[in-house]
Amino acid sequence: TLGERPCFLCDKNRPKDQMSKQIDEKFHLLVNPFPILPVHFTIPARKHQPQLIYKNYGEMHRFISLHSDLMVFYNGPKCGASAPDHLHFQAGTNGILPLQTNWQRLSRNLTDIISLNDEEKISVVRDFIVPAFVIISKSAESDEALFRRLYKAMPQRGDETEPMMNIISWRKGEEFISVVIPREKHRPEAYFAEGDAQFVVSPGALDMSGLIITPREEDFRKLTEEKALSLL
């Protein structure tokens, strides 16, 4: 079970040859040993603590303010997180997710719902494969203030530790963009199906952004556009 297995993000349990860099007083930067993206890092908290975003969202802004060539993403504890018991983000190659490659088109059809000023706001993303919100900001203070308002407005089930969500953040010039994707379920029905109907896909931020990861080759080979949409 989760509580019985050694946490693979804690210092004492990581392989000795795992390269690590301390990026601030709270987080390390690790090379992801199982990369999905051409450049792929894991950013675990130095202290073992649950995967919770509310008080840690600012770390995403800080990271891309220093590394504009990367995007950073967050998987909620039941939204694709590989270690729901240890706070972590991931970062990787910027600009290759379908969400990003289509952003110029998507950004032309946003519906603003909360605005701090003409440039900083929360909007609804239309025309994407899944419903989503976007936070557009120019400063860390505005980014965090807008995220807190969105977080508090999102539904949270009684047995969940936070509203279910994935977040993908990147920087474009002076503009910080965070797409927040609300989630209804941890895994699709096809995950629990039997025989040929089964697809072992547990969507995280990358999947919800249009880059579906299939651990089994057989699932990849039988994936269609219609099935891909049903998995999200």
What are these regions, as identified by a protein language model?
Residues 75-78, 92-94:
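An acidic- and aromatic-residue-enriched active-site/binding cleft used to recognize and process polar
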Residues 65-77:
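Conserved short secondary-structure elements within globular domains
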